[in-house]
Amino acid sequence: MTEKLRQILNAIKEFSIKALDGAAPLAKSAAARVPELAGRLFSFAVEWWRFGVGALFAVLVLYYPAGAFFFNRIDVNPAFNDGSKAAVKTADTLAALIGREVDKHAFTPNLPFFYPAAVLDNMPAYQTGVIDGAQKIAAVLAKRNPDAAGLQKAADALAYPATVWHVDDWKPAVSSDKKYRAAAADIAKYAADAANGDQVFDNSSASLKSFAAVLAEQLKSDSDTLAAQIAKGEKRVLDWSADTVFYTVKGRAYVWYLIARDLHSDFETAFLQAGVRKHWEKAVAALKSAVLMQPMVVVNGSPETQFAPNHLLGLGFYLSRAAFALNDLEHAVDAQSDE
């Protein structure tokens, strides 16, 4: 038994010696390859660092700026929908305008940060103003034509906040553009029903006065908004919020212009009177001048300065002229009714 144990121990010893003799070259080989492996790891890290820098460059320089440039569009086409032969042109233009801003152009006020257009500032302000103006006009249409339930429904939908995406406060939500798309459909249906005789449009002098009064009131409110921003700008070297105010008001002014322009088609009888027509032409001309203002950079300089313009002041001037002309139009309609 002792002899067998000795043989086993000797066999283990010989195996261990051979194993160590065989492992020595492997250890030397592994030690020799350590610098090579370290170099490969370093090269791998450098390549990924370069890729990361390139990806960051693509996002910061290409994705956001190029994407924003592609999406950016402040559409102030003065001839928009002017060729419409709809029975109620104001309603037809309003529906088409909402559809244009929501579907044809990207609706930007509610886009989250991962969209390139989310970095835009002026276009969201402009579109917010357009929707706000559209809501005011839809409310007037609903008030003057109470039998058309779709108009009030549209006015309510247009009052929905413009900044809601598909998620709000981490909960699923109805997006702003979906609400506005439904509003445009309701207004378009009313216009189609009026053309077919299934709905009526109040084209009385009282209705024209309502439109003129609301437009004049809104124009004065916009002028006050601009005046308040001008007063703030006098205390600053640079006014970073001036462009937002300018384009929000300009978006509303574009709606006022289109609706004022189309009043002539919807109230033809009233416009046979020269006085009414004269004041309407002044209002439309002033509003057209307002919406065609397109400064490269909005400047809110002091009204007394000789070195910097004040684009808000210029916009307010045209809006005030239009408001006075619409007030005069109201008086002309009254005078016509008294005859």
Report the location of each language-model feature.
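N-terminal Sec/ER secretory leader and immediately downstream segment
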Residues: D75-S176
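Short, charged/polar, low-complexity loop and linker segments
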Residues: D82, F107-V119, N196-Q199, A228-S241, ...
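Juxtamembrane low-complexity tails/linkers enriched in Ser/Thr-Pro and polybasic
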Residues: A30-F44
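A cross-kingdom marker for long, charged
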Residues: D82, W256-E339
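Extended amphipathic alpha-helical interaction segments
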Residues: D177-M293
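Short, well-ordered, aromatic-rich surface patches in folded extracellular/luminal domains
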Residues: T163, V167-V214, P309-V333
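Hydrophobic membrane-insertion alpha-helices, especially the h-region
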Residues: R50-A66
